[in-house]
Amino acid sequence: MAGGLLQLVAYGAQDVYLTGNPMITFFKVVYRRHTNFAVESIEQFFGGNLGFGKKSSAEINRSGDLITQVFLKVTLPEVRYCGDFTNFGHVEFAWVRNIGHAIVEETELEIGGSPIDKHYGDWLQIWQDVSSSKDHEKGLAKMLGDVPELTSISTLSWDVPDNTVLKPSYTLYVPLQFYFNRNNGLALPLIALQYHQVRIYVKFRQADQCYIASDAFKSGCGNLQLDDVSLYVNYVFLDTEERRRFAQVSHEYLIEQLQFTGEESAGSSNSAKYKLNFNHPVKAIYWVTKLGNYQGGKFMTYDPVCWENARENAAKLLLLAQYDLDDWGYFQEPGGYECEGNDGRSYVGDCGVQYTAVDPSNPSEEPSYIFNDTTTAEAFDGSLLIGKLAPCVPLLKRNKDVDLKDKVEGIIRIHTDFENDRMKYPEVEKITRNDLTLHDLSVPISKYDVDNRVDYIKKFDVTVWQHNNFGLLIDGSGNPTHEAELQLNGQPRQSKRGGIWYDTVNPTVHHTKSPRDGVNVFSFALNPEEHQPSCTCNFSRIDTAQLNLWFQHFTNHKFADVFADNDNKVLIFAVNYNVLRMLSGMAGLAYSN
């Protein structure tokens, strides 16, 4: 007997539960016929000029019967530097990461003059983090502008021609996430809204919050303007019979809305309590913390593509910062003003520079100068001088931490003009020790107690905006939430849990993807991404709801004054169900706030 037949006749009482009275077969495809329809994406335009810092609306024309997906099309301008480079120096520029989400401050859906739902750029980023498939990451990165050609730092040197292009023009396609955008079964029936107009509002962020740049760029960039803004709306065209049915009957849709009560201050303490003024059956709560450091703070280096490169670049800048250089990075004559070191002594030169004699007259080999080790530094004799910061004079230091110059060592090559018998400029040939950490790179310049870097090096500082950074460090790592507890009517909804429970365990259980650090989820639903309800908590019937947060402990820690800051903000969102009714050509919500 064949093995397959042996399996077939091995049939017992338990098999009745599996194959008794069968309802399907795996060997005959069964499909269902659908109604006849067609889909076309049609461009819709905003009224008036819509640019950075402005708000406008697009009226959705009745070009089809239903609408589903909507994409916000934004064309970023070509970025050129048009200023007087000789007056300002080092020019650096990059668009922020996920500029497609970051550029949107808020977007709102309105039907018949009544607001139905409002989303925010931060929420669009959070929702993508938890719900997008890894298979779509490459495409979404292109659509949202999270590509190296936009986010990597572009640099201009002093000897470039005017109007040099820093970034090319680029077109973004930002998917909106209103209830009918995410589920074809909830397509918005324009054919049933004969007397109500549908509008979508968009408000953009200010331009200077959408890029990372040095002071030199900001002094000569001019006003950045968006080249083109519109909506691409997917219209569904129905066959005659279904079209008539949609137009004549009333409709009642179970929809999803977003609730957001505004930014809350995290304060400078280790804990905070937030009252949740939410309504309706809520399926999930999401919260993030945005550190003020990364919302307009100035840093000495930035490289979102590779933070190891940023660490190396910071070491090079710290090595060069100890030389007495002019505004173009060349050696300047010794002298200048006096400054006082930690030992109380006065040092002559640019912020306490010690001068060591160097002889450039030997053309056989350009000299190398070993930094940060005065006992083994090579001695040179000659008439020209170079400067090195005196060991007792701090370079870039916080009172609670060591001087950053003590964390790096390297070999510096001195470029020399032998014909004119003079020193030209230093260049880092090799980094021999680099003890800088991401914590060091995450400290904004304003939070250093001492900054004795020469002005030339300060020109490399960049102002950073990271709208998608919900972590502790500049690379987005670390959850600011140490522990959390949700209370309903004064009672804990569940026991206090660690931050990893909310930004790792809960998203892994309830969502498609584990998000970046700091995106915290409390889900009442089994499957919060699905439209089918799978448990909610009716906040309309809760008298008091409160989210208690304990932030990462920095008490008596050397970084306490860096990460515990009054500029830190907590953003709390809730996704709820509501009912949208359509009758006699008009629409309205069944339950208001």
UniProtKB/Swiss-Prot annotation:
Family: Belongs to the NCLDV major capsid protein family.
Protein name: Capsid protein 1
GO cellular component terms listed in the entry, alphabetical order: viral capsid
InterPro entries referenced in this protein's UniProt entry, alphabetically: Capsid_N (IPR031654), MCP_C (IPR007542), MCP_C_sf (IPR038519), VP_dsDNA_II (IPR016112)
Keywords of this entry: Capsid protein, Virion
GO MF annotations in UniProt: structural molecule activity
Location in the cell: Virion
